[in-house]
C-alpha cells in the first residue's frame, strides 16, 4: 500500500515546481542555513568527506557547491588496462547488457526505447541498435560529477524536456519508460569504438544538469533543443578518457551506450553492483 501511494504521488506532484524550489534552497548562501542543511545532509546520507578536496562541509559557499564537490588528486585512479571502458560515475549499476529490438532493459517488466531516450532522432539512435548499454544510478551520498568512459570528440548534445519522476528501485519497477520520460541531456561522441552516447537523466529535486562545454543546460523554454558540434563554425570539443563531462546539481542517473560488437562488460558486474568513476565497466572488443 505504501509503495502504491508513493507511485501515485509521483504522478500528482508538481515536479518542476519542486525542483525549482530545491534549486533555490541549494543555492542559498545564508551561512547558518546552508551550514545546517549541508551538515544534516552529510550525516543523513553518510557522505564520506575524507576524499573531498575540501573536507569541511561548512566551507562550501552553498549546498550545490558541496554536492558537486571535487575530489582529491588520486581519489579516483583510472584503470590503466589497455582497452578498458571506465565507469562514468560513482554509484551502482542499475542495469547493463544488450540493446535488444531497439530497447533498453529498465526493470522486470519494463524497458524503454533508445530512440526516445536520445530525443527521437532516428539517425542518432541507429548506431546503437543491437549495441550495449549500462545504467549507473548515483545516490545522494555519491560523488556527482560524470566523466568520460572513453576519449571522444563531441558531435551533438540534445536537451530533451520531460517529467522529473524520482529515480530509485521503486520507480524503476513501476513507472513505464522512466528514463525516456524524465528530463535529460544526451551527449553523443565519436570514439575509437565508434559512436558513444552518455545520457545524463534528471530526477525529482534535480535542480539542473551542467556540462563542461555548455555550463547549465536548461533552455529558457522547456522544448527539445539540439546543439551540433561537428560544424566548421564550432571548434572541436575533445575530451580525454576520465575527463569530467558534466555534473548533477542533485543527482540521478548516467546511461552509456555503445554500438554492436564494440564492448564486453566486466563479468562480475550485475544489477546492484557498486562502482566508482575510473574503474573498468567493460573491455573493448578486439
From Swiss-Prot:
Pfam families hit by this protein: PS_Dcarbxylase
GO molecular function: phosphatidylserine decarboxylase activity
Keywords annotated in UniProt: Cell membrane, Decarboxylase, Lipid biosynthesis, Lipid metabolism, Lyase, Membrane, Phospholipid biosynthesis, Phospholipid metabolism, Pyruvate, Zymogen
GO-annotated biological processes: phosphatidylethanolamine biosynthetic process
Catalytic activity: a 1,2-diacyl-sn-glycero-3-phospho-L-serine + H(+) = a 1,2-diacyl-sn-glycero-3-phosphoethanolamine + CO2
Topological type in the membrane: Peripheral membrane protein
Residue list for modification Pyruvic acid (Ser): 252
Site (Cleavage (non-hydrolytic)) location in chain: 251-252
InterPro entries attached to this UniProt entry: PS_Dcarbxylase, PSD-B, PSD_type1_pro
An example Gene Ontology CC term for this record: plasma membrane
Compartment(s): Cell membrane
Top-rank lineage group of the source organism: Bacteria
Its biological purpose: Catalyzes the formation of phosphatidylethanolamine (PtdEtn) from phosphatidylserine (PtdSer).
Family: Belongs to the phosphatidylserine decarboxylase family. PSD-B subfamily. Prokaryotic type I sub-subfamily.
HAMAP family for this protein: PS_decarb_PSD_B_type1
NCBIfam families membership: PS_decarb (TIGR00163)
Stated name of the protein: Phosphatidylserine decarboxylase proenzyme
Gene: psd
Amino acid at each position: 500500500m505504501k509503495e502504491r501511494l508513493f507511485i501515485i504521488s509521483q504522478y500528482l506532484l508538481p515536479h518542476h515546481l519542486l525542483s525549482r524550489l530545491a534549486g533555490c534552497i541549494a543555492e542559498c548562501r545564508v551561512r547558518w542555513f546552508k551550514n545546517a542543511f549541508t551538515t544534516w545532509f552529510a550525516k543523513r546520507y553518510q557522505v564520506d568527506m575524507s576524499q573531498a578536496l575540501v573536507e569541511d562541509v561548512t566551507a562550501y559557499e552553498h549546498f550545490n557547491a558541496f554536492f558537486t564537490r571535487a575530489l582529491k588528486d588520486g581519489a579516483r585512479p583510472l584503470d590503466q588496462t589497455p582497452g578498458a571502458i571506465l565507469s562514468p560515475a560513482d554509484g551502482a549499476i542499475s542495469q547493463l547488457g544488450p540493446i535488444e529490438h531497439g530497447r533498453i532493459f529498465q526493470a522486470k517488466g519494463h524497458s524503454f526505447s533508445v530512440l526516445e531516450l536520445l530525443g527521437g532522432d532516428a539517425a542518432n539512435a541507429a548506431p546503437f541498435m543491437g549495441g550495449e548499454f549500462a545504467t549507473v544510478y548515483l545516490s545522494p551520498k555519491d560523488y556527482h560529477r560524470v566523466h568520460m568512459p572513453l576519449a571522444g570528440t563531441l558531435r551533438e548534445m540534445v536537451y530533451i524536456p520531460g517529467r522529473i519522476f524520482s529515480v530509485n528501485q521503486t520507480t524503476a519497477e513501476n513507472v513505464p519508460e522512466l528514463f525516456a520520460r524524465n528530463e535529460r541531456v544526451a551527449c553523443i561522441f565519436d570514439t575509437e569504438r565508434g559512436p558513444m552516447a552518455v545520457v545524463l537523466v534528471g530526477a525529482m529535486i534535480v535542480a539542473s544538469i551542467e556540462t563542461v562545454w555548455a555550463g547549465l543546460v536548461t533552455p529558457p523554454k522547456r522544448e527539445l533543443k539540439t546543439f551540433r558540434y561537428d560544424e566548421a563554425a564550432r571548434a572541436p570539443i575533445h575530451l580525454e578518457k576520465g575527463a569530467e563531462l558534466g555534473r548533477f546539481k542533485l543527482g540521478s542517473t548516467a546511461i552509456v551506450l555503445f554500438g554492436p560488437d564494440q564492448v564486453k562488460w566486466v563479468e562480475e558486474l550485475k544489477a546492484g553492483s557498486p562502482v566508482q568513476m575510473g574503474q573498468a565497466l567493460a573491455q573493448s572488443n578486439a
